[in-house]
């Protein structure tokens, strides 16, 4: 079981930007609220909520804040109704982009998202134009030094989908969304604490970006979308070469 993860550089970049802008907490609270509203407040029965809690704790959110968000979503406290929506489009060079949003005003959100696409050489597509290119998975990045054999022994009973080797030699465990929590628990029981983990949308195939100017245009689109208050996550099939990433840093 071997492969290559091409999205790690963008995930890490996005996390750093969100933290820098101070927006990560508001996005995490919304995810906790909606996850508990849709699947209930019991973590054992709600893989999405488990993933949201893990991400909130990793970003140093207090347990009290997490619990309040869960209670709000589960209906124990009053709060504004948030609606989930996904927008699909294409960026420069035909890069496929999925934008996950939570909003209390669809008209405002679609207008903002459309503006970001049009201002950066892209266009907002129709429903289904891009989504078929992506699939939902859980991914857990393991610490350096963990062997594939050790990872397999630790997680086999939890039924991961795959274990892939990333460009830097570290391992990434791939799971279905439903098995994400079980696989993470199995790793922790084996004293293997993932350095990063999430459930997200990943492309079936990638569009290679090999020149710096195109990369800048694509990343500018990502930045503008991520700056929008209603946007939770931005996913893309862009694959930036190591040479391009080095020039951009």
UniProtKB/Swiss-Prot annotation:
Q: Which cysteines are joined by disulfide bonds?
A: none
Q: Which UniProt keywords apply?
A: Cytoplasm, DNA-binding, Transcription, Transcription regulation
Give the UniProt record's GO annotations in the biological process aspect: regulation of DNA-templated transcription
List the GO cellular component terms.
cytosol
Q: Which Pfam families match?
A: TACO1_YebC_N (PF20772), Transcrip_reg (PF01709)
Q: Does the keyword Metal-binding apply?
A: no
- Which family does the record assign? Belongs to the TACO1 family.
Which species does this protein come from?
Chromohalobacter salexigens (strain ATCC BAA-138 / DSM 3043 / CIP 106854 / NCIMB 13768 / 1H11)
Query: Which Gene Ontology molecular function entries are recorded, alphabetically?
Result: DNA binding
Q: Where in the cell is it found?
A: Cytoplasm
The organism sits in which domain of life? Answer: Bacteria
- Record-given protein name: Probable transcriptional regulatory protein Csal_1845
């Amino acid at each position: 079981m071997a492969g290559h993860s091409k999205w790690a550089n963008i995930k890490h970049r996005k996390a750093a930007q969100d933290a820098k802008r101070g927006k990560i907490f508001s996005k995490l609270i919304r995810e906790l609220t909606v996850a508990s509203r849709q699947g209930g407040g019991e973590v054992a029965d709600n893989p999405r909520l488990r993933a949201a809690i893990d991400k909130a704790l990793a970003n140093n959110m207090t347990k009290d804040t997490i619990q309040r968000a869960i209670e709000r979503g589960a209906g124990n406290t009053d709060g504004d109704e948030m609606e989930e929506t996904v927008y699909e489009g294409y960026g420069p060079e035909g890069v496929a982009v999925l934008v996950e949003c939570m909003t209390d005003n669809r008209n405002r959100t679609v207008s903002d998202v459309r503006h970001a696409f049009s201002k950066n050489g892209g266009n907002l597509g129709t429903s289904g134009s891009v989504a078929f290119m992506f699939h939902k998975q859980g991914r857990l990045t393991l610490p350096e030094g963990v062997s594939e054999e050790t990872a397999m022994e630790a997680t086999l009973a939890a039924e991961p989908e795959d274990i892939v080797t990333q460009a830097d030699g570290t391992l990434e465990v791939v799971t279905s969304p439903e098995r994400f929590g079980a696989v993470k628990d199995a790793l922790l029981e084996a004293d293997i604490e993932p350095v990063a983990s999430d459930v997200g949308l990943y492309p079936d195939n990638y569009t290679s970006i090999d020149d710096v100017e195109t990369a800048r245009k694509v990343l500018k689109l990502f930045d503008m979308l991520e700056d929008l208050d209603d946007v939770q996550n931005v996913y893309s099939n862009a694959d930036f070469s190591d040479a391009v990433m080095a020039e951009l840093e």
